Amino acid sequence: MNCLFLFMSKKPKSRGNMEKEKKNIRGREFLQKSAPELTTRKTTLSFNLPTPRSLPSPTSIKDLYTDREQNQNQNLRVFSFKELSDATCEFSRKLKIGEGGFGSVYKATINNPTVGDSHSSPLTVAVKKLNRQSLQGHKQWLAEVHFLGVVNHPNVVRLLGYCSEDRERLLVYELMSNRSLEDHLFTLRTLTLSWKQRLEIMLGAAQGLAYLHEIQVIYRDFKSSNVLLNEEFHPKLSDFGLAREGPEGDNTHVTTARVGTDGYAAPEYVITGHLKTHCDVYSFGVVLYEIITGRRTLERMKPLAEQKLLEWVKKYPINSKRFKMIVDSKLCNKYPIAMVRRVAKLADHCVNKIDKERPTMAFVVESLTNIIEESNSEDMGSSVGIRG
């Protein structure tokens, strides 16, 4: 089966355009057979990858869905299973770059044809292959296509296409070659992120979350492993399988099954299942403490009193001299301690047990921006001893 592109053209129908329209029809027929959920108009799902020019500064995710349906400018690429199997050498272990409960992620090289051009160039991508046995995996696959097919932001990973063939469900993303924030904080030993890099990564992640909240989407799974880094260490949020539309009208929350990752989920959500944007803010605060300490939110191999990050850091008050003891030793004292304290105070604000007392992500973006600007005015390489 050939690769298909879904799109509509407003230009006069030349012979080339007629051929493209035939591909469009074949693509819709293919989807109706393999994943009818994606062609049901009632769900207002769309598979266009928006461009800044086409994005009308929407007020909600529903506006994006409506805009894509009316525009009908659908251009997410539909891959055949054979094409992705060939691109990954039949999903070779040598090309596997990630694995989780959903399935596995592989590095692959695909042809990248330009519309209207018979030539193509190779493109390196990431292919996520879901476990065939997982019903939940299929739901999350739909959710990813659902959201990433319409959102467009520099700090949200770009979905290039998908495959839905028989029971196979795959997603194709831009490749984030520097792996995840989690990898650099806890796993990789070849490179330590500087304090400045950590702040800039968290600022980008905050901007991505602020955008999602602006269009009324709750991410629900913010954690260091979902912050991916490209070759320039530019951060992008990934894995939208748990994302949900936010509350409407006078509703203050949406009620969902309690899912997520231990240590990152807000306590009120764990108890009640009530989901708000405040839940994402809590998770963000947890990751702020991860970049400060170089510790995971849960360290089960540590002594019992040190296993839970948020409980452990309370023993080292921010304004005390002992606070320096929790800062990641891999930073080798190369950070302005006053700025680290400010980030810790922001983290405390984010993880406030009273959800309404937490800041908005827009406030977090502003705060981190100010901290970075002030940090840049200081010597980022000075030792903590000098800064006291």
From Swiss-Prot:
Q: Which residues bind ATP?
A: I97, G98, E99, G100, G101, F102, G103, S104, V105, K128
One GO cellular component term of this record is: plasma membrane
Q: Where is each Protein kinase domain found? A: 91-372
Bilayer topology: Lipid-anchor
For this protein, the record's Gene3D superfamilies field holds:
Phosphorylase Kinase, domain 1, Transferase(Phosphotransferase) domain 1
Q: Which key words are in the record?
A: ATP-binding, Cell membrane, Kinase, Lipoprotein, Membrane, Nucleotide-binding, Palmitate, Plant defense, Serine/threonine-protein kinase, Transferase
Any one Pfam family here would be PK_Tyr_Ser-Thr
Q: What reaction is this protein's catalytic activity?
A: L-seryl-[protein] + ATP = O-phospho-L-seryl-[protein] + ADP + H(+); L-threonyl-[protein] + ATP = O-phospho-L-threonyl-[protein] + ADP + H(+)
> EC number(s) per UniProt?
2.7.11.1
Q: Where in the cell is it found?
A: Cell membrane
Molecular function (GO) terms for this protein are: ATP binding; protein serine kinase activity; protein serine/threonine kinase activity
Keyword Chaperone included in the entry's annotation: no
Which protein are we looking at?
Answer: Probable serine/threonine-protein kinase PBL20
- Organism field: Arabidopsis thaliana
